[in-house]
C-alpha cells in the first residue's frame, strides 16, 4: 500500500466516525487504564474522573483484513479515597478490513479491568485485574479466545519545563486463558504533551507490551509488540481532538494465526477534557 493510499484513507476519517459510533454502540464500552495523576486528592470523592475516547485509525498494510482500527470506551475513577483510587475500564475495539465491503468489521476485542491503588510519595501503585476477549465479526463462530491477568501497575505524572509527562508500567500473570499460549504480560506507556497556544498543542506517545509464552504450548519465544505515534491536539470547550500518525507492530494480529503484523497508521481520536 502506498503513502498516497494511506493519505486517502485518513481523509475519509469523517466517514469512519459514524462507523465507529455504530460499532461501539453494539457493545458495552481503550483507555487501557486509569491515567496518571499529578498528586493525590485532598478529600474523599465519588466518581472523580472519566477518561473517554472514540478513535478511528487507517492502517497501511498489504492485507485486506486490516484497513481500520477503531476504539470506543473509557476509564472511570469510581472512588478516590485520598490514599488511592478504585477504577474500572471498559473498551470495545473493532478491526475493519476491505474483503467484502469498504468497511468490513471482521474481529473485535473486549477489554474489562478493575484496579485499586495507593500513593507512595509521588508514585501511584495499583493492583489490577485485566480481562481481554477476542471475537470474530460477520464470520463463522469459532472457539473463545480470551485471557485474564492479575498484576500490578505504577503510574507517575510530572512536568519538565512546559511539557507534561505521563508514565505507566505494569506486569502480571495470566490466571486463565483460552486458545492463547501467554503465561505473563508486561507493558509500558509514555506520553508527552506540550501546549503551543490555548487551543493547540502537540504530543507524542510510545507504548509496548511483552507476552511470556508457556513452553509447553509450542516452540514460540516471548512475543513483543509496540506502537509509536505523534500528532496535534486541538482543544474545544468540552473535548479534545487528536490527529496523529505513527507505526505499530501487533502480536497475533489475527486471533487464529499466531503471526505478528506491522503497519504505518494515521487517524483521529476524540477525548474528553
Where are these regions (language model features)?
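Cleavable N-terminal export/targeting peptides
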Residues: 1-34, 273
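Transmembrane beta-barrel domains of bacterial outer-membrane proteins
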Residues: 30-273
